[in-house]
Swiss-Prot record:
Identification of the protein by name: Nitrogenase vanadium-iron protein alpha chain
Binding site for [7Fe-V-9S-C-homocitryl] cluster: 257, 423
Binding locations of [8Fe-7S] cluster: 49, 75, 138
Organism of provenance: Azotobacter vinelandii
Matching NCBIfam families: alt_nitrog_alph, N2-ase-Ialpha, VNFD
Record lineage: Bacteria, Pseudomonadati, Pseudomonadota, Gammaproteobacteria, Pseudomonadales
Gene Ontology biological process: nitrogen fixation
Signal peptide, first to last residue: none
Amino acid sequence: MPMVLLECDKDIPERQKHIYLKAPNEDTREFLPIANAATIPGTLSERGCAFCGAKLVIGGVLKDTIQMIHGPLGCAYDTWHTKRYPTDNGHFNMKYVWSTDMKESHVVFGGEKRLEKSMHEAFDEMPDIKRMIVYTTCPTALIGDDIKAVAKKVMKDRPDVDVFTVECPGFSGVSQSKGHHVLNIGWINEKVETMEKEITSEYTMNFIGDFNIQGDTQLLQTYWDRLGIQVVAHFTGNGTYDDLRCMHQAQLNVVNCARSSGYIANELKKRYGIPRLDIDSWGFNYMAEGIRKICAFFGIEEKGEELIAEEYAKWKPKLDWYKERLQGKKMAIWTGGPRLWHWTKSVEDDLGVQVVAMSSKFGHEEDFEKVIARGKEGTYYIDDGNELEFFEIIDLVKPDVIFTGPRVGELVKKLHIPYVNGHGYHNGPYMGFEGFVNLARDMYNAVHNPLRHLAAVDIRDKSQTTPVIVRGAA
């Protein structure tokens, strides 16, 4: 049976349906892990909430927009400054977040007046910013505050501003994935086709599902500029509020993160007939394939091949240097959703690194279907993995490096296993040709860092001898 019940889960046997071990000659469609389902009580889930999926992942990335969190201060603090998505206007989105700072009395008597006051104060404090997104949180949703009515009143009082509301409290879904969906659908229902922008190229597209982590969007933008393609809107990396209102003007929707942003691409296709094209931007082979797909759509294949050749000539020798030193290493991926299937084949093909275990916090069954198809036999696939499962899986597969976020990364350090930040990156960008060399460099530095050997020594134990560190030793 390919579904696995770990030792730590023996008292929660329901978890067996969420953990899959790929075996030879199996129809993986029969054995997909249950995903996008409510967390089993007692499993200590590491998932983010639905509000987090809307604000932290998508809305909070916009570079020219006030982010107003209608709720307790903690909801704003928890989703501020935890993602590295810089912008070309001084990182406005990373510097500021706004909260109505709801207290017990506001929950009892209602918070709409407090929200209205906070919105006016925010616009007064930031006179150059005319756009705002307002989010509900658990307490303000439970008491029924009508944030749409408040937003309409503020826009009536201030005709030069525009406000978008996201009614996605943390409890509204099983994971942050619900927040992605709510914001996607809300935006196309309320804001798309409310503005027109100047079209300057015969080739136009929306780039959807990229959030400019450490400059991903800005690096890929250099490719689109060289190909002569105008990006109408970035959803939402280094993007602007008003550009997203013009998404209906594009000829093509290019989707990178399908889990967080595929919904709006599907709706743009239904309502405006704009085709959807999914690509992978991590990895040399995947990036080249994505460029070829886009160029084939626009009929500019020669330009695409020229770009790929230039990038390969510049970066492939550096990638090969790292591949020679990483070949045969084992890696575990412990991240959110689609990065599992974006990364698993790229690190294996381009770097010779074997992926031995993967866990997804908010992936759906279709995400597991993709990653299992790309993965190798003997690999573990876990939905909504918890800390105890993490320790047991790591002990079973013994990876040389782990891709995860800082939260799990702190646990990894205690196990004396190097990790690379798969959420906010160590030293990105990681997308594109140059970006994948950056990723290989960070993997190499993590795996071969001599300092980690020192961490394995308990200085309180006099029987242990401090190891001699040899330069260049693994």
